[in-house]
Amino acid sequence: MWGVFLLYVSMKMGGTTGQNIDQPTEMTATEGAIVQINCTYQTSGFNGLFWYQQHAGEAPTFLSYNVLDGLEEKGRFSSFLSRSKGYSYLLLKELQMKDSASYLCA
């Protein structure tokens, strides 16, 4: 099996709505594995949570948008949202080398 390096960046969203978003900084996994990327947030006004994938030197690519609580599945990627807990996660199944990237929640 080949190793896959996944990089997570910490993001803090500021502005009039007072949003804060925190993610882990990095993680390693192997091809074929299942990886869960957690994201916690605090906000005074919630309009939904986005997940993006960003490869080095490229613009972010949209993966999912959650407004309602629960699990949204889209191919090998699933995203979960709990508004009451200020928590979301992105689940990557059957990990592939092309999944080596930064993952952002916003």
UniProtKB/Swiss-Prot annotation:
Signal sequence, renumbered to the chain: 1-18
Glycosylated sites: 38
Keywords of the record: Adaptive immunity, Cell membrane, Disulfide bond, Glycoprotein, Immunity, Immunoglobulin domain, Membrane, Receptor, Signal, T cell receptor
Ranges where the Ig-like domain occurs: 19-106
Disulphide-bonded residues: 39-105
One Pfam family this sequence matches: V-set
InterPro entries referenced in this protein's UniProt entry, alphabetically: Ig-like_dom (IPR007110), Ig-like_dom_sf (IPR036179), Ig-like_fold (IPR013783), Ig_V-set (IPR013106), TCR_variable_domain (IPR051006)
Annotated GO CC locations: T cell receptor complex
One GO biological process term: response to bacterium
Highest taxon, organism lineage: Eukaryota
Subcellular location: Cell membrane
Major subcellular site: membrane
SMART domains associated with the record: IGv
Complexes and interactors: Alpha-beta TR is a heterodimer composed of an alpha and beta chain; disulfide-linked. The alpha-beta TR is associated with the transmembrane signaling CD3 coreceptor proteins to form the TR-CD3 (TcR or TCR). The assembly of alpha-beta TR heterodimers with CD3 occurs in the endoplasmic reticulum where a single alpha-beta TR heterodimer associates with one CD3D-CD3E heterodimer, one CD3G-CD3E heterodimer and one CD247 homodimer forming a stable octameric structure. CD3D-CD3E and CD3G-CD3E heterodimers preferentially associate with TR alpha and TR beta chains, respectively.
Function according to Swiss-Prot or TrEMBL: V region of the variable domain of T cell receptor (TR) alpha chain that participates in the antigen recognition. Alpha-beta T cell receptors are antigen specific receptors which are essential to the immune response and are present on the cell surface of T lymphocytes. Recognize peptide-major histocompatibility (MH) (pMH) complexes that are displayed by antigen presenting cells (APC), a prerequisite for efficient T cell adaptive immunity against pathogens.
Name under which the protein is recorded: T cell receptor alpha variable 1-2
